[in-house]
């Protein structure tokens, strides 16, 4: 048996190659398509106590690309935020560092392996508590800066505003943009913090910012030839008249245009948590 899972996917499979056609033609029609063997994987501690994924794929001469993913803490697969992780090949094994913030919390990891014929396989899902493996160390740190460049915002492209400040511009005026990285403890808001960001727009626009899809607030993006900033307390976002209790309970943030506005004309930058 085999499987492939798209990280951060939502019923979409565009990053899973040509699996369906290849599998059906091979196993139903009997055509002679190449199909790789199962990869082997395990999470270990390195010599300094940092967790790392050791991945040994099959049919390595046919590999086109390989991407490792990591998730911290939550055992609820619906709420997981999967980070992209760099890996280094060491002989027949790819090794990826998995930095953690707490050695007594779970770390999860798996990889997607794309082959030359556009078949994509996922490795097994590995889950460990690092302290159970030995003398583990926590090397990751919490970040109040949410977005550097495009960050994890969906449907955006890199953009530069006045003064050379790097940010992002939403590309789809119908879908807007969304960020789901806040279930990761690295980017979860500190209690009683506020959301701050900068924006650059030379034409006035109106947008709706929401948290967890339910709590919303209307924002006026005023026109200016300079960067502007905005700071939002959690209670400003409402759902049926009730304010968001705290930014720390937010797992996702979305920004959508109001009817008649064009969000693609707005450049956003430097989303961060502030006191």
Residue ranges and their predicted role:
Residues 1-14, 20:
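Histidine-bearing beta->alpha loop at or near hydrolase active sites
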Residues 18, 22-70, 74-76, 83-99, ...:
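Surface beta-strand/loop "capping" patches
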Residues 87-92, 101, 220-228:
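Short proline/glycine- and polar residue-rich coil/turn motifs
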Residues 99-104, 237-241:
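Short, surface-exposed loop/turn segments at beta-strand-coil junctions that are enriched for proline
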Residues 104-118, 251-256:
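Short, aromatic- and glycine-rich surface loops/edge beta-strands on solvent-exposed regions
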Residues 113-124, 260-264:
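Short acidic/polar inter-strand loop motif in beta-rich domains
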Residues 118-150:
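Short beta-strand elements
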Residues 161-164, 169-243, 249, 257-267, ...:
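Extracellular ligand-binding interfaces
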